[in-house]
Amino acid sequence: MENKKENFSEWYNEIVTISDLSDKRYPIKGMNVWRPYGWKIMKLIDNIIRNAVDKHSFDEVNFPVLISRGMLEVEFEHIRGFENEIYWVTKGGKEKLEEELALRPTSESAMYPMFSLWVRSHADLPLKIYQIVSVYRYETKHTRSFIRIREIHFFEAHTAHESYEDAEKQMDEYRIIWTEIADALCLPFLYDQRPEWDKFPGAMYTIAFDTVMPSGRSLQIGTIHQYGTNFSKNYDIKYLKEDGTFEYVHQTTFGMSERLLAAIIGIHGDDKGLILPPAIAPIQVVIVPIPGEGVERYAKDIETTLNGIGIRCHVDNRDNYTPGYKYNDWEMRGVPLRIEVGERELKEKTVTLAARNIRGKKTVQREKLVYEVPDMLDLVKEKITEDAKKTFNSLVVSASSLDDFKKEGLIKAFWCGSKECSDKIENETEKSALGFNLNNDETGKCIVCGKAGKLAIFSRSY
């Protein structure tokens, strides 16, 4: 396997392949095949997202993949932001369609005509829905598994509210939801408000959740958008107020994609392979029997016990592989915890525990497994989080001059917010403005022009 520090790009590509996450050999560029193991991980990530949003009164929906040109063109600024990325369906069978249909690049234009039918009065608000679907964008840049592709596994939440203040409260709620998701995935991040020229098409403002890969490049892993009434006026989404007058709703959205998996691979993995947070590991505990009389039955009994307390456990009883090969194989797949059992453990009624990311082994009594295994999985998660934060912090650099921008990572510097100063930084350092950092409200002089500025983040991005 490639060395992660020396050649991150090749290491990443290799680990995606050998861990059976995805196969990029499908004969359409940027449309990769999810392998079973990768899809299981992604579905577990989806479940974390569902659990996080469901507790905040969101309902899941599923909209059609096709959007008519007319529906898209209702909001001109929105389609202008995507027009070069849209896949168009122009024929049905052999017949040319009267109106072209788009494969959804995102779902505002699909959902909001329906919102205008669903929302009638203040009693229908807030409206809070989400879906997890494929979206399609004609990506012309270099594609990379889970990072930049043409068919994207996508979560999108859409809301409608009575007032701007209620929509702002929803924006705050998104940050609470996101923090819960990021904690489960052990992902460090910064909140950045995107510059005006980089906000989502049609939004009043956009806040992004940015992390940094070991290569030093930033990776956007989530966004939230305040729409105000920009979309509701165009799609005629209004409600009857208690005083008998009509008002346009205020809207927000929240989006994430399989980039979450890309971040997990890149940030947590090592030269042995994946390191998976327990919450998203398809197999949380693998039991490797060392051949001996009665050992396999002992292993199966342990599997039954752990499955019974909600641990995803699997006995590797493959006959044609040695225990050593199995250890390496499951380490490569990122399984958080390994249990080794042989004749000695059977005789002593013990097991040997080996965590994926913690050195050494631990012998515990069989009867204490139901306590020891959950505790060990908690320790695995804590160590993943600790290591990720350590790497993240090492790649966040405070700059006092443009010379400091030569360093890799997320560069923190004061900036006035002007496009002119941003362009100068990008032209001289190849690092663009991600936006103002919302984790810190410090102020200072712009690193370029010397005018009053706020703390901003700059980086080369994926």
From Swiss-Prot:
| Stretches of the chain forming a coiled coil according to its record | none
**Superkingdom of source:** Archaea
* Known partners and oligomeric status: Homodimer.
**UniProt keywords, alphabetically:** Aminoacyl-tRNA synthetase, ATP-binding, Cytoplasm, Ligase, Nucleotide-binding, Protein biosynthesis
Question: What's the catalysed reaction?
Answer: tRNA(Pro) + L-proline + ATP = L-prolyl-tRNA(Pro) + AMP + diphosphate
Predominant place of localization = cytoplasm
Description of its domains: Consists of three domains: the N-terminal catalytic domain, the anticodon-binding domain and the C-terminal extension.
Q: Which Gene3D superfamilies match?
A: Anticodon-binding domain, Bira Bifunctional Protein, Domain 2, C-terminal domain of ProRS
Which is a Pfam family this sequence falls into? ProRS-C_1
* PANTHER family on file: BIFUNCTIONAL GLUTAMATE_PROLINE--TRNA LIGASE, PROLYL-TRNA SYNTHETASE
Family that this chain belongs to:
Belongs to the class-II aminoacyl-tRNA synthetase family. ProS type 3 subfamily.
Instruction: Give the protein's recorded name.
Output: Proline--tRNA ligase
